[in-house]
Amino acid sequence: MSLVEIIEGKARILIPNYKDYMKDGKFDPSWAPVFYNPKMILNRDLSVLAANVVKPKSLIDGLSATGVRGIRYGLEINGVEEIILNDIDSDAVELIKKNVKINDLESRAKIYNNNINSLLHEIKVDYVDIDPFGSPAPFLLSSFSAAKSKQYVAITATDLAALMCSSKTSARRKYGLICNKMSFSRELGLRGLISKAITEAAVVEKAVTPVFSFYNDYYYRVIFKVERGAKKVDRQLSKLVYYYECPKCGYRIESEYLQQMKCTNCNLVMQTYGPAYKESLVDYEFLNNMISELDKFSYFQTFSKLKSILLTIKDESKYSENYYRIDFLASLARVNVPRRDNVINCLVDASRTHLDPLGVKTSKNLDEIKECIKKLSSRNTS
């Protein structure tokens, strides 16, 4: 395996030479013997920023591949005393060893060639990071088991086809979801992922609360705070609901029960999604701490984009309702789609959402949003 060196964050990382694995002039990271995805740099930048808020003394990068994520934690977060890097693939482990050495982390790094679930059941750390190719569902129970009380677990999910209902059978198998596409499916997918995490953690009597959640390109990223106690677990389980939306008029409702719900306006059977987490997707204090710390990381390759995402999330987190998609409501009203910023100005109390370029978050009700869309559309055509 020939290698090339790249720089990411403060780390020097050896990765497989992509030119050796190209097919018909194209390259996919999964074709290389050890996986490295440059499209996930923003994910890793954000993860370093969030972990800097947590300041763990011990952590595990459970599915390490090249080791880039765990190595960056060791180099870019003050106070990390122990970094556990693990991969089940022996080629990956050999590459991790090389990368740990060239970054002078041998005294703090422990490298394993284990099944990640087995390893997680043997350790206790302050911060667990699971970044799989696909679903994190098989690793949730062991991840929460490995996290110390009042510490953190961070997960990535790239199987959005399941979480956003393109594959209803996968949604049921992997996440226990009753899954129908709705106008705000990107938010529901995130809430469905959090719901699965809460129910898995409950098995080991741990209550998990999302302190930061976001969507980018083709994945979700969620950071959970983990606490012990049956009563806390029960409180989190009580925050799981089913969402219903009318495909004809856009009317929405939530219920703690799974049932066939009919729209009170149209008498049509409503689309169903759940169980899904109904509370805030971020902890406001944690988010503000991330924003406050960001300037320390101006060297991030994705600094500008990351700052924009965080500020948008700060704005939208003021609103408890799920986002509304402008083109969906415009199509129901049979009018042209107005610009999002114009809709926000019309509503006054509203913001963009990072989840969807056509989405708005607002305190206003459905009828008020529709009225703004109609009014703006009539101006454009007059």
Curated annotation (Swiss-Prot):
The protein's Enzyme Commission number: 2.1.1.216
Catalytic activity from the UniProt record: guanosine(26) in tRNA + 2 S-adenosyl-L-methionine = N(2)-dimethylguanosine(26) in tRNA + 2 S-adenosyl-L-homocysteine + 2 H(+)
GO molecular function: tRNA (guanine(26)-N2)-dimethyltransferase activity; tRNA binding
Top enzyme class: transferase
Residues making up the signal peptide according to the UniProt record: none
Amino-acid positions noted as binding Zn(2+) in the UniProt annotation, renumbered to this chain: 246, 249, 263, 266
InterPro entries (alphabetical): SAM-dependent_MTases_sf (IPR029063), Trm1 (IPR002905), TRM1_arc_bac (IPR022923), tRNA_met_Trm1_C (IPR042296)
Pfam family, one: TRM
Top-level lineage group: Archaea
Binding positions (S-adenosyl-L-methionine): 44, 69, 87
Positions in coiled-coil regions: none
Keyword terms: Metal-binding, Methyltransferase, RNA-binding, S-adenosyl-L-methionine, Transferase, tRNA processing, tRNA-binding, Zinc
The Trm1 methyltransferase domain, residue ranges: 4-373
Biological process annotations from GO: tRNA N2-guanine methylation
Family: Belongs to the class I-like SAM-binding methyltransferase superfamily. Trm1 family.
HAMAP family according to UniProt: tRNA_dimethyltr_TRM1 (MF_00290)
Function: Dimethylates a single guanine residue at position 26 of a number of tRNAs using S-adenosyl-L-methionine as donor of the methyl groups.
Protein name: tRNA (guanine(26)-N(2))-dimethyltransferase
Gene: trm1
